[in-house]
Amino acid sequence: MQSKLLLSTKLTSQGKTQLDQYFVSPPFKVMTLPAYDDAWQNGLNAMQMSSSPGLLASDLFDIEISLADDTALSLNTQAFTRVQSMNEGDYATQKTCIKLGKNSRLFYLPHPLVLHKDSSFKQTTEIEMSEQSELIYGEIVAIGRVLNGERFAFRHFASYLRISYQNRPIIADRIQWLPAKMALTSLSQMEDFSHQGSLTYVNLAKNAVEIKAMVSELQALAAEQKNMLIGVSQLNEGGLMVRVLAHRADIIQHLFERIGQVLKAQSNIV
């Protein structure tokens, strides 16, 4: 099955963000949500939904998101994405392409990805920033259905994230897991944890001193958390990354939502 989700935003004459172009093929659907108290005033809140029980062999999910100048979008998902069991040599794929217009802001936090036994999954995410644009993007992955006794029972997981500005890379993050060939429970890998999360923040309007202060604030927040291993690193330019290991998906999800609110509150864009 090949599925497509295409959405873009526009700015109304009242200065509010609305959906502009919108196209989905099954199992995708997008629902706009009521506005809530948020530091990004006049932004759009939306939920990405899916009626699929999960990705099967040869499935391709193609997601394209484009934000117009001066718009703000907070996009969440409805439920976990599950990669189902498949024959050896088969795999499912997801491709995500995001373009941010000048002065636009995006918060995108999909629900965790769950890798079932004998599954293989490849995903690529490419994000193009523009002048004064701001990005908060999170990914969470589970090593299997742990409560069913599945730990690293999948065959292959590959994830590539590339964020660029004017065709110049700001960050490239690649994850490659082959449980049959890699000691993924060793020190400096997953150890005894079952869930990994990554949250990337990019705001090229912030200087190194401002980003460093934000890193310090998030490190203090991380120190308060229990049953998680958290690292916060400053990027070479205009941003930071948070990496988390935990035993449950929901605590990473809640932490990233809280961090998102902290970062939104320090937005330089009114």
Swiss-Prot record:
Pfam families: UreD (PF01774)
Localization in the cell: Cytoplasm
Keywords of the record: Chaperone, Cytoplasm, Nickel insertion
The keyword Aminoacyl-tRNA synthetase is assigned to this record: no
Family recorded in the similarity comment: Belongs to the UreD family.
Cited function: Required for maturation of urease via the functional incorporation of the urease nickel metallocenter.
PANTHER family attached to this UniProt entry: UREASE ACCESSORY PROTEIN D
SUBUNIT field: UreD, UreF and UreG form a complex that acts as a GTP-hydrolysis-dependent molecular chaperone, activating the urease apoprotein by helping to assemble the nickel containing metallocenter of UreC. The UreE protein probably delivers the nickel.
Identification of the protein by name: Urease accessory protein UreD
